[in-house]
Amino acid sequence: MTALCIGLMSGTSLDGIDGVLAAIEPSGAMRVLHHAAQPFEPGLRSNLLKLNHSGPDELHQAALAANALARAYAAIVAQLLRDSGQQAGDITAIGAHGQTVRHQPLLHDGTGYTLQLNNPALLAELSGIDVVADFRSRDLAAGGQGAPLVPAFHQGVFGRPDTTVAVLNVGGISNLSVLPPNGQVLGWDCGPGNALMDHWCQLHTGQPYDADGAWAASGEVQARLLNRLLQEDFLHTPPPKSTGRDLFNPQWLNDRLAGFEGAAPQDIQATLTAFTAQACATDAWQHAPEAKELIVCGGGALNRELMRQLQAGLPQTAVVSSEAHGLPPLQVEAAAFAWLAHKCVRRETASLPSVTGAQGARVLGAIYPR
């Protein structure tokens, strides 16, 4: 029987919330019926950015931010219901990822932790719909990275029986899925996505992102700085691996800008764009040289300069937006969490040990009944 599920995603780019209403078949095949998006209210975005780092009174602030997120999520759910003409009782579940503010797998005590701010109980109360949340912790408990979780979804949506396909999600952090026609699906975080570019753009232009990559295109890449950025150890660590703003944050960037204080801001932006492009293209070339197509999703797919550089770095591979495959780039991750929620309520495993390094496949998510 076809199930209607809602997926909600607010990623490490911190640009806002994307929501989709999707129809999902028992086989896992799905189609997106409606999409809604809402930027973060500036005060909430500012608080979430601060909570990516240790600070005073952070437990109190985190709890209030989780409540605010739940209310913002509920508003997106209400919009999707209005737009579709559906009632709350028609929806099987909401998959609400939450907002990642810490991601430190396999550290400290050997298990580590991942923390996504969310109040799924409040969201269930406000929406009248079962909510699935906390998708990553179960994989960590099984010895995995807890990320990325979307390669299984990518395989279902973009995989082909006759050729290897690579899928690159460029949100705040970038991650790559390698989908062979036969064999294990692979996936990992490449490193930076939009996070550093967006930070620099906001700092120097007051804009939340570099529209079309036009500002970066106006600058000149600083080769010495780019080489310094590319020396980051994470980039040279073999998969499975995952990262977040714990690593690629403004302090990380400031530490590496020492000696470049006189560089023009647009040149730094050009260099940060080249950094993301090279980190991603190198991973695709090294781990999926046979892929004829690199499908790009997330906000980075809308950055023309980034897409141009990815294509230049992968001349034998067609670099295309997920839009070319019927799924707009800003809808892909939200659709993935609708799909993961459906898996959870059916008690079906959704993690891939070949991706996260976990001891086995696990059912992901915790259910908060309406």
Model regions and ranges:
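Short beta-strand-loop/turn "lid" adjacent to the catalytic site in phosphate-handling enzymes
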Residues: 55-118
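Glycine-rich phosphate-binding loops at beta-strand->alpha-helix junctions
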Residues: 101, 291-313
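Non-transmembrane, aqueous-exposed alpha-helical and coiled segments at domain scale
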Residues: 88, 264, 268, 280-287, ...
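Phosphate/ATP-binding catalytic cores across multiple sugar-kinase/actin-like superfamilies
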Residues: 72-80, 265-290
